Curated annotation (Swiss-Prot):
Species classification: Eukaryota, Metazoa, Chordata, Craniata, Vertebrata
N-acetylmethionine modifications at: M1
Binding residue positions for Zn(2+) 2: C62, C65, H83, C87
Protein name per Swiss-Prot or TrEMBL: Histone-lysine N-methyltransferase SMYD3
GO annotation terms (biological process): cellular response to dexamethasone stimulus; establishment of protein localization; methylation; myotube cell development; nucleosome assembly; positive regulation of transcription by RNA polymerase II
Reaction equation(s) it catalyzes: L-lysyl(4)-[histone H3] + 3 S-adenosyl-L-methionine = N(6),N(6),N(6)-trimethyl-L-lysyl(4)-[histone H3] + 3 S-adenosyl-L-homocysteine + 3 H(+)
InterPro entries: H3K4_H4K5_MeTrfase, Hist-Lys_N-MeTrfase_SMYD3, SET_dom, SET_dom_sf, SMYD3_SET, TPR-like_helical_dom_sf, Znf_MYND
Amino acid sequence: MEALKVEKFTTANRGNGLRAVAPLRPGELLFRSDPLAYTVCKGSRGVVCDRCLLGKEKLMRCSQCRIAKYCSAKCQKKAWPDHRRECSCLKSCKPRYPPDSVRLLGRVIVKLMDEKPSESEKLYSFYDLESNISKLTEDKKEGLRQLAMTFQHFMREEIQDASQLPPSFDLFEAFAKVICNSFTICNAEMQEVGVGLYPSMSLLNHSCDPNCSIVFNGPHLLLRAVREIEAGEELTICYLDMLMTSEERRKQLRDQYCFECDCIRCQTQDKDADMLTGDEQIWKEVQESLKKIEELKAHWKWEQVLALCQAIINSNSNRLPDINIYQLKVLDCAMDACINLGMLEEALFYAMRTMEPYRIFFPGSHPVRGVQVMKVGKLQLHQGMFPQAMKNLRLAFDIMKVTHGREHSLIEDLILLLEECDANIRAS
């Protein structure tokens, strides 16, 4: 058995944590984990396979609930142990669909009732997880009570009373644990496709300037060092989207994870001025418009996404710089819409405008920047811009060999793009 490179320890002021057992290099794989339980997120339901979380145009439905969808009979067969007990519950709740946290907890309970040890709990178990109940406001507690009631209604086909739950299982506390400890599972394009629980990885504390990153290969989690780490040094990840001001980061950390971030970046409001460059009234309007754009994206309404993004971008020409994070997010959405609509020339136009802001906001080796640069290189390759494509594909490789590792499926795709680009350069 491979020796662990990380160990649990008690920090001075942040409770439990993970630290390095020995010196670590950038790109070194520190931990890999399948989830204790996971589920497709609501926005990706019917778009990605419920088992492998990969997108496919034609997915086959579960013949019983007709809600779960799979890319192949093989995935459907592998998914059955996790889906079996929720199947009748999904069928009975139609047309209403449970929140992600409700479906996830249902799967967690099935795993806990199974009583087989899970590799995901090697360092920390579900029962060890922090719930932060004592720190929750009454409004938050009421929200958890509502979730517990929704859960009881959803699982009524399988669980009629507390005797059918694991011993000493507290539903209210379990939901608090799920909210605080679940991981958003992202696909190769860093888009949210699922949510899962990886108990050992819940030991990782937050930093706005982390020394590790997490990426996913389907539901499989990979933790890597992104810079040199000394033996005994605490390992950290960023819990949040990096395109947030210090005030926004602190608020989300306080609301979801119940702690105040006092890191140097938050204390000095690092990069806040860059993020909010431009006319405040205009970027606040764009910030509000992003809610509608994200809603349209969640329903894959790409024509409407693009129309709204273009209207915002055109109306704010010369008034809001691309480095403003809300303008940047609109450019990103416009690029995604163009890619999904097959408008590759327009997609490249928007993508190129994101390159410099991404360099500033995602310094060093960051998976989000690596994927963005790869997208730009791929778009340039498809338009015959071979020297430019080669430059960006190589840059993407340099970043992603650290963040993703050479065995990741996305790196394999990137190597094929590099080979294709090289062949075109040689032939021209």
